[in-house]
Swiss-Prot record:
GO terms for molecular function: L-isoleucine-2-oxoglutarate transaminase activity; L-leucine-2-oxoglutarate transaminase activity; L-valine-2-oxoglutarate transaminase activity. The keyword Transferase applies. Keywords: Amino-acid biosynthesis, Aminotransferase, Branched-chain amino acid biosynthesis, Pyridoxal phosphate, Transferase. PANTHER family: BRANCHED-CHAIN-AMINO-ACID AMINOTRANSFERASE (PTHR11825:SF44), SUBGROUP IIII AMINOTRANSFERASE (PTHR11825). This is Branched-chain-amino-acid aminotransferase 2. The lineage of its organism: Bacteria, Bacillati, Bacillota, Bacilli, Bacillales.
Length: 363
C-alpha cells in the first residue's frame, strides 16, 4: 500500500496534566488523537492527528446496534535517558488485523497505523508519567460508522487512537489478588469471538465481574464454555500456574485471546531454562495440586497489569491460599524483567522495544 501523509493539527488549548502520583486507570486523556476513515470505494484514507474531541455520529451508526468494533491496548514509557519506548507494538497491529478479520472489518496497513501511533505519542510525549508503576496507555480502536439498521458488515469505519496516562490497573498493584472461579457464566466458546479483541467479549463479562467484586474478589477465573471444566483466562488476562516446578498455561484453542504479554512470558521462561507447557488444564488439577502441596504460584498476564499474582483462589466452597498469599518468585522476576525492558532499564535481548523518534520541530 502507498503510505499516506499524516496531517497534523495541534491544539491551541492544552489541558492541565494530572499528578503522576495520583493516577488511576483510563480516566484522563491527552491533548490529541489519531483518526483515519474507511469507505468501501476509497479504502482507508485521511490519516490525521487532531485535538482530542468528541465524535459526531449518526444514531443509526452500526457500531451502536451490532457491536462491530475491535480494539487494542499497549503502553509507552520514558526511559531513564529520556527515550520514549513502545513494547512490541507491531504485535498489536498484527492482532488488530486478526480481530478485524473475525469481525468483517477491512484490514489496516499495519505500518501506516503504527507510524500514526508513533507520531501521536511523540506529540503528546509530555503526558507520559514517570512515577513508579505508571505509563501512557495507548488505545487503538475501530468502529463501524455506516447509518444502517440492517444486520450486515458496515461499508464505512473510523479508526482512532487515544492516549491516557495511567497508574496501576489494580489498586493492589503487584500485590496478590483474590479471584473466584466462575461456574455459571462463560466468557467465550470455540468458534465464537473469544480469540478476537472485541467489545462484546468484555461487555458479556461484566455481570460475572460485578458479582465477584460484590464478594470481595478482584477478578474471575473463566472456565471453558462447553464442559465448564478447563481453565481459560482470568478476567481480561491470560493465566499461568506453577505446579511442581512446571509452569502451565492454557493452550490457545480459539476461545482464548493470544496475549502479547503471554507470549513474552513464555519466551522469557524458556530463555531462563524453565519447563513451560501450553496445554489443557482442568480446575480439578489445580485443586488437587493445592491439596498435594505442589501448587506453587499462579499469576495473570496482560498489557494493563503486566503481571498480576494470584494470592487466593475460590472454587465453590474451597478457598485456596497460593504461596501463603504472597507474590511468587517467578511472578516477581517476570514483572521486574518485563517492566525493566519496557522502561529500558533491563537489556532487551529479544528486540521487543521500539523507540519513538523525537519530533524535529517544537510543539
Amino acid at each position: 500500500m502507498t503510505k499516506q501523509t499524516i496531517r497534523v493539527e495541534l491544539t491551541s488549548t492544552k489541558k492541565p496534566k494530572p499528578d503522576p502520583n495520583q493516577l488511576s486507570f483510563g480516566r484522563v486523556f491527552t491533548d490529541h488523537m489519531f483518526v483515519m476513515d474507511y469507505a468501501a470505494d476509497k479504502g482507508w484514507y485521511d490519516p490525521r492527528i487532531i485535538p482530542y474531541q468528541p465524535l459526531s455520529m449518526d444514531p443509526a451508526a452500526m457500531v451502536y446496534h451490532y457491536g462491530q468494533t475491535v480494539f487494542e491496548g499497549l503502553k509507552a514509557y520514558v526511559s531513564e535517558d529520556d527515550h520514549v519506548l513502545l513494547f512490541r507494538p507491531e504485535k498489536n497491529m498484527e492482532r488488530l488485523n486478526q480481530s478485524n478479520d473475525r469481525l468483517c472489518i477491512p484490514q489496516i496497513d499495519e505500518e501506516q497505523v503504527l507510524e500514526g501511533l508513533k507520531q501521536l505519542v511523540a506529540i503528546d510525549k509530555d503526558w507520559i508519567p514517570n512515577a513508579e508503576g505508571t505509563s501512557l496507555y495507548i488505545r487503538p480502536f475501530i468502529i463501524a460508522t455506516e447509518p444502517f439498521l440492517g444486520v450486515a458488515a458496515s461499508h464505512t469505519y473510523k479508526l482512532l487512537i487515544i492516549l491516557s496516562p495511567v497508574g496501576s490497573y489494580y489498586k493492589e498493584g503487584i500485590k496478590p489478588v483474590k479471584i473466584a472461579v466462575e461456574s455459571e457464566f462463560v466468557r467465550a466458546v470455540k468458534g465464537g469471538t473469544g480469540n478476537a479483541k472485541t467489545a462484546g467479549n468484555y461487555a458479556s463479562s461484566l455481570k460475572a465481574q460485578q458479582v465477584a467484586e460484590e464478594k470481595g474478589f478482584s477478578q474471575v477465573l473463566w472456565l471453558d464454555g462447553i464442559e465448564k471444566k478447563y481453565i481459560e483466562e482470568v478476567g481480561s488476562m491470560n493465566i499461568f500456574f506453577k505446579i511442581n516446578g512446571e509452569i502451565v498455561t492454557p493452550m490457545l484453542n480459539g476461545s482464548i485471546l493470544e496475549g502479547i504479554t503471554r507470549n513474552s512470558v513464555i519466551a522469557l521462561l524458556k530463555h531462563w531454562g524453565l519447563q513451560v507447557s501450553e496445554r489443557k488444564i482442568a480446575i480439578d488439577e489445580v485443586i488437587q495440586a493445592h491439596k498435594d502441596g505442589i501448587l506453587e504460584e499462579a499469576f495473570g498476564t496482560g498489557t494493563a497489569a503486566v503481571i498480576s499474582p494470584v494470592g487466593e483462589l475460590i472454587w465453590q466452597d474451597e478457598t485456596l491460599s497460593i504461596n501463603n498469599g504472597e507474590t511468587g518468585e517467578i511472578a516477581k522476576k517476570l514483572y521486574d524483567t518485563i517492566t525493566g525492558i519496557q522502561k529500558g532499564a533491563v537489556a532487551d535481548e529479544f528486540g521487543w522495544t521500539t523507540e519513538v523518534a523525537a519530533l524535529t520541530e517544537s510543539k
